[in-house]
Amino acid sequence: MDKALLEIRGLKVGFPTPDGLVRASDTVDLDIYPHETLGLIGETGSGKTVLSMAILRLLQPNTIIKGEIRYRGRDLLSLPEDEMRKVRGREIGVVLQNSGTSLNPVYTVGDQIAEAITLHQGLKRSSAWHRAVELLDAVRIPDPVRMARGYPHQFSGGMQERVLIAMALACNPSFLIADEPTKGLDAVTKREIIDLFREVNRDRSVLFITHDIEAARNLATRVAVIYAGEIIELGNSGVVLSEPAHPYTRGLLESLPERGMRPIPGSAPSLITPPSGCRFSPRCRCAAEDCKSEHPGLVEVGPGHYARCMLYDRG
Amino acid sequence: MTVSRKIILAASLGIILTYCAVAILAPMIAPYDPHAITGAPLSPPDREHPLGTNDLAQDIFSRLIWGTRATLLIGFLGAAIAVVLGTGIGIVSGYYGGMIDEAIMRIIDVAMTIPIFPLLLILTTFFRPGIYVIAVLMGLLGSFQGVRLIRSQVLSLAVADFVTGTKALGARDSYIMGRHILPNVLPLAGVKFVFSAQHFMLIGIGLGFLGIGDPSVVDWGQMINRASQNGAIILGLWWWLIPPGLAVTLISLALAWLGYACEDEINPRLRLLRV
Amino acid sequence: MKGVYIIKRLLTSLAAFCISVTIMFILLRLMPGDYITMYLETIYRYAPPDVVEAFNHVYSFDRPVLEQYLLYLMDAFQGNWGYSLIYKVPVLTVIGEKLVWTMVILVPATALAILAGIGIGAYSGWKRGSKVDIALMNGMIFVRAIPSYWLALMILIIFGYYLNLFPLGGYVDTSALTSGIDPLDVAKHAVLPILTLFLFSVTGTYYLMRNSMLMTAGEDYIITARAKGLDEMTILRKHAMKNAMLPMVTMVTLDCAGMITGSIFVETIFSWPGLGMLTYKALLFRDLPLLQGILLIDTLLIIVANITADLIYPLIDPRVQVGDGV
């Protein structure tokens, strides 16, 4: 196995709020290897986006971040800001959530893509523009020459998503983070975006954040399931998404329409005062006495397959 | 609320309350009757007259104290009228929507193109009204702005789930507007009240400064006007010129601080990153 | 599409103007006593009846009210706004002259206020909560709370009297009587009024811009810009500013229109012979035609400002077309 491209060790992210400290990430360890797509699955509020923002240090200035995030051996969390800026966009690209509001409404789409190119690759405006048009073509936007001069509000949701992808790929980064790229899209467009990512993911490592299990199944080699700021299952996507070890993952799959659409009872726990012991225990069908008092560790339950559950962590 | 915010709030409320107290207790605090002639005109401050006397030998200190009444009255009365009217119309317009809303907004649109200050000037010149009338006029003319503000908030409230739910229970419109919409709109109206009060006080004093306004009432604006007209600048009659101005500025500041502090609390603009 | 909208706009503006004229007309009718009493208070008692009759005829008081109203309306549209009592010349003429002088101080002050307000407000909003922001915000609140007449007086006293840097008022020295108007002299006189006007309006622009920037700074596309690797200053300059300035355009154009009457205090204190000073004089002498004229000019200016704002906005915001009900 090659050395990991991205190593996250002991990541803790907390937001101080008037009501207390929100522990959005609580001791996360994760590795992402070259040319793999890691799917990160979780509900809203589980801490998925926080993870991606933490990698690029795009969180609010008063956020508390502890731990290490090593990219190609360098700890990103300890880099000076101007070094970090060189990493953003060039070495690590990100496709942010909410394509509609993530594009600046007063600049053309071409300008916004070209901006990333001029910044990191120092090309002149005209060459950058050409490259932008090429990128629009690569993400399968029809008539890219004309569309490059268009404004974001003139694009449909799916096309805006593609523009964001083009922008993220502008400098050909070796690591891409995609945050819920299929959210809010209709079934047809979803499939198109997933197809696009199949191509895009071939040449790089991708952290694919989603709550869409289909997308994860189609694109990810491995998946990590996140719940209440913790990774609770990690493994090969084929295995995890068909024979999940953790009750939560099982619940997620069962809540899919084709599997019976049985929702998981209860709601997402508070990140300020998470439940004691196993964080999923309040909602877990198999919860036993020790689940409420013991906090399970992430243990191996199969080859390369890990789960954080008392079922596997008892003595 | 942060500590500094609390200090500002306390300080501004303290100042405002002090002014109110002075206004109410004026007859007891002021050493002289504000219109009475007491000693030599244009005399500098001394033991008898802490702030000296003006051209009519009236005690400036007493006039300053009595002037608080006019100022506070114009400000608070005018603001009250403006906010009550503005909120009322805003709620009706925003809640009912449709034709009523269109009609009201058209009227407001046209009304807002009429310059309020010149109109006020002309009205007060020709009717020489007392300060109550001035306050009412300002309140009326100043209510238009508030309507827009309140209405936009009501628009989003009117389609909120809890309103639809209450309607489904069969509640009357007036009940919904009074019981559910009004409380939600009160914070905004409250802030508007504070700022309007400040605004109207400044205009009211301004009118006095221009020589319009109620001559029977002691008015800081008039004091400043008379002072500068009697050569206070050249003659260095600082005790006449400066105190009224400071008095206005202080209450204006207090109200502004109060308004901004409250506004910041109501509209948190810090956007928390979605987790 | 655009044409229909423009016509609708013009019609609304026409309505607004008519309503202002109507209000003036009603005010005349409601005047305690009648028109003549207002005009010729003292002479009335002594005026022989045929003079009174001639007067009534000239001012059309001997016709039915409705006819008077229509004549009044027509006059208003033709620019026939009557004669000033003080100056004995057509109202429009005297307003025109004085308006120019108001512009001399108003335009530089407003231009500077807009530039400064936008720049400082943007920076303040971007760095919300920082020491600079808090200091600026408190400073601006302080200045804005000071009534404009008080501010003007203080500036006059401090700079004009005590420091003796600038003249105490007027727009020219008496030397102009012999050697004509010297632009430099006018400029020297204009400094303090411009300073006062500037201080007063910069607070408004600052506040609006800061608010606008606060909202813009929290938008998603700012995070996108950071994710691309841009530095903070570039993001502020390129991405944030343009978006934050959009709502400013409407605000600023409307503000400009209201400035005319706002200058009444400043002009009175500095004895600057502009529209504000004219208004003051008209009030003092109860020159009704002049006052009507000033009201109408103001209404016109607000209407023009509104239409300008409506037409400019679509040019700078690519999302908006003319007639989108902005």
Predicted regions and their residues:
Chain A
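Short catalytic/signature loops enriched in Gly
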Residues: 4, 145-146, 234-315
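ABC ATPase NBD coupling module
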Residues: 76-93, 111, 119, 239-244, ...
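P-loop NTP-binding/switch modules centered on Walker-like glycine-rich loops
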Residues: 185-260
